Swiss-Prot record:
It comes from Paraburkholderia xenovorans (strain LB400). Its cofactor is (R)-lipoate. CDD domains: GCS_H. The lineage of its organism: Bacteria, Pseudomonadati, Pseudomonadota, Betaproteobacteria, Burkholderiales. It comes from the Bacteria. Keywords: Lipoyl. This is Glycine cleavage system H protein. The glycine cleavage system is composed of four proteins: P, T, L and H. One of its GO terms (biological process) is glycine decarboxylation via glycine cleavage system. Transmembrane segments: none annotated.
């Protein structure tokens, strides 16, 4: 199982990458996609909306279960990955390249609540 050291993580199994312009790119971890199994559907429900950390932003469904995807920080959902919406199983084959949505963090976004790769690894018992 892969847990890239250059990303931040949430306890709810999202990975977060900070882009040069300050936006955050969000996806689900390798651990999460393994637990879900074959992913068959993905939809961002909050595109263009301002959300709080922990709010449900998207839904991802597999042959086993449906899972909510949460905002890692407060901010505005500015983009959804249409490639993943069209071909959801990309998340199974390339979970760290197949991002789900982008968020423009609010000025008071609590980025320090995100955890590093070591802490995430420990949280899943890896």
């Amino acid at each position: 199982m892969s847990i890239p050291a250059d990303l931040k993580y949430t306890e709810s199994h999202e990975w977060v990458r900070t882009e040069a312009d300050g936006t955050l790119t969000v996806g689900i971890t390798d651990h999460a996609q393994e637990a879900l199994g074959d992913i068959v559907f993905f939809e961002v429900q909050e595109l263009g909306k301002t959300v709080s950390a922990g709010d449900t932003v998207a839904v991802i469904e597999s042959v086993k279960a449906a899972s909510d995807i949460y905002a890692p920080v407060s901010g505005e959902i500015i983009e959804a990955n249409s490639a993943v919406a069209d071909t959801p199983d990309l998340v199974n084959s390339t979970p760290y390249e197949s991002w789900l949505f982008k968020i423009k963090p609010a000025a008071d976004a609590a980025l320090d609540r995100l955890i590093d790769a070591d802490a995430y690894s420990k949280s899943i018992g890896a």
